[in-house]
Amino acid sequence: MKEIEKLQVGAYYRMDDAEIAEIQNKAIALCQKIDTVSILDHSIREQLFRKLFGSVGKNPSIKPGFRCDLGVNIHIGDNFLTNYNVMILDMATVTIGDNVWI
């Protein structure tokens, strides 16, 4: 079983796995890119959220400073909002429902 598969089923896995590191690096780069896009440019920011997260509902709003482990394990519902400097550790699945503000 590959390390990423172990991670996905909640089993012990090696943090130094190249595939996991690649996903983490992509998440870091996307979080940095999101921070460079104006908070007023909703469409571009939403496109980036959709690249970062496993699934995204309607009308997501994430203030600057957002960070996560992998991104792909985060699933957010409609009307999701985070305030500044939020970190979600998603080495396991994180599901956030509709109308949630953090």
Regions found by a protein language model. Give the residues of each.
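Secondary-structure boundary/capping motif
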Residues: 16, 71-72
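A structural motif detector for beta-strand N-caps
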Residues: 58-68, 74, 78-86, 94, ...
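Terminal amphipathic alpha-helical/low-complexity segments used for targeting or macromolecular assembly
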Residues: 1-59
